[in-house]
Structures are given as structure tokens and as C-alpha cells.
Amino acid sequence: MSSHYEASIRKPLIEGDKSYHDITVDIARPIETPPNKDWWIAFSIAVIAFLWGVGCVIYTIGTGIGSWGLNKTVGWAWDITNFVWWVGIAHAGTLISAVLLLFRQKWRMGINRSAEAMTIFAVIQAGLFPIIHMGRPWLAYWMFPLPNQFGSLWVNFNSPLLWDIFAISTYLTVSLVFWWTGLLPDLAMIRDRAVKPFQKKIYSLVSFGWTGRAKDWQRFEEVSLVLAGLATPLVLSVHSIVSMDFATSIIPGWHTTIFPPYFVAGAIFSGFAMVQTLLIIMRKVSRLESYITLQHIELMNIIIMITGSIVGCAYITELFIAWYSGAEYEQYAFLNRATGPYWWAYFFMMTCNVVSPQIMWFKKLRTSIIVSFIISIVVNI
């Protein structure tokens, strides 16, 4: 009787027994062919949402940031909550690409492009809120430590707003370089298939002369690993800095040291849910069912379930520390959340963030496209 262990054969990450040529044709099809009906529907919804957002920004700048609910007693309103939300969903892209690359998880290859692109646009969106929050966005450059003609006027390095500027700009730079580096082979592939001279010229510029030589691939892997090593601690540090916006205040219920790990776990949680939402839509719109498989969706759901449990543990820890502290103001802050006028929002949050991901314990549910899409939307809410 043999005593050694034989691992079972893993399921292929790409379905359909496709050749390299088949993969190239399928991946290039959305660029080389006219958009289908599903794409136009998704694009129309995105354009409507974009125009709505532009209108809201113009109204806010014209009316004043008081329209967001900000006043002398309310310092955290529509702007900072949306800022944290966008930064949070931006973290999943770097985490999927960087951490899973370092751990040699091959299943990242089907979803990392979408996640990285989501990161870039989410970080840009997040950066808009501190700028608008200033009330005078045309003076946003004042947030940078630039030489000026106002004598001793300088940025306040003790301000969380300045911390956010450094965190967001650094994260955007590293994420952009990481995303572009990963795109080089794909851009070169589209360059070689391009027919129109203008398109060929553009793709030649953005692919940086990639030829596919062994030396190119060697440098590609080395740079990818270096960037992944830089981006991984960046994921942890950026949202820890964002959490300091709240943790450095003296308001009961907010002045707590649990915020950095709690915010990081929540960011990964919401970010993976947003990636799941986009992947399910994209696999349908772009006909990529063979590349974004049920195996990818199931693994994403497992991570959502784990991070949702971590967030739930953080909620319970907050309540316990408030009780254990014996500080009546701290206890009242948490008791008011659960029993005060906004009790319904508190329990709705607990249901969405803690209870709903637990159904992913059941394999039949976590491999269901409809259930996965609904849960990802619920978590994002």
C-alpha cells in the first residue's frame, strides 16, 4: 500500500481547451469588433451615472459644501464617507494583483486586469472628494507643499487631509505603473494585430517596444515582483492612513486604535465585492465565460466571506471595548448607534456586511451567478 499522497488534478482555469491563438482572438475581439447590444446598455447606464455625478458636483461647488450635510458640528458627511468607500474598493485591485502574484496564485490571471483598472478609476474618484471638500477646488494645489509667495504659509503636516493627499498620490502612482506594466504584452499583441496605421502607431507607443523576447519576459517578471512587493505594504498603509482621519479625533466612539486593521479588512471586503460585481457583468457583456469561470467567482466569494467575518469580528470588538472601558460617553456612543434614531441603519449595515456573506459557506450558493451578484451588490451597499 502506497504511503505517498497524490494531489488530484486541478480544474483548468480556462475552459474549452483553447489554444494560444484562440485566447488571443477572444481577448482582442472586444477591441477589434463593433460593440454588441449588452455593451451599449452597460455603456449607456455608465454615461447616465457620469452625467448625473457631474451635475451633482457642479451643484455642490455652486451651492456650497453645506449641501453635503457639513456644518460646525458635523465634520464627516457625504464627502469623507464616499472618499473612504472609493479608496476601499480601490484596494482589491492591488491586492488581487500584488498579493496573489507573490503567493503564485494562478487564478488571478483571469481577473487581475479588471481589478487593476477598477483600482485606477476608483482612486481618481476618491481623490475628487478631498478636493471638493475644500470648498474652493480651484485652489487644490495648496494642499501640496509647494514654494509660494505668501511668506510663512505652508501646509499643515498634522492635518489628516494632507495625509490623504500623500497616501492617494503614492497609491495612484504605484497602481498605475503596476497596471501599465502588466498590460505591455497585451498592448503589443493588439499592436501586431492592428490594421490601421494610426492605431498601430498608438499601440506601439504605449507598448514601449515590447517584442516578446526572452529578455523582455525576464524583465517583465522581475519588475512585476518588485512592484508587487512595493504595492502589498502600500495596501495596508494607505487605508491605515485613511482610518487616521477618524481615529485621531477625540470624539467618543471614533478615537480608537482598532481602526487601521478594521479599515484594511473592510477595504478588502468591499473591494472584492465590487470586483465581483464588475466581473459578473463583464463576463456576460464581453462573452468571457471561458476565462472568468465559476471557479474564479467561487474563490472570490470565499475571500468575501472571510473578510466579512473579520469585519464582523471588528464590530463585536468595538462593542466589547466600549463596554469594558467603563467610559460612559464611549458606551453611550455605541449604544446610541444600535438603539438611537438610526438603529435601522445600524442593523441594516450589520445585515449587509456580516450576515449576508455567511451564506457563502454553502457551495451551491457561492457557485451561483445570481446569488453572487446579489450578495456583491448588498455588500457594496
Task: Give, region by region, the residue ranges found by the protein language model.
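Generic start-of-chain signal for non-secretory N-termini
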Residues: M1-S44
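The first (N-terminal) embedded transmembrane alpha-helix
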Residues: L13-T24, I45-W52, W86-A92, P233-V242
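Central hydrophobic cores of alpha-helical transmembrane segments
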Residues: V371-N380
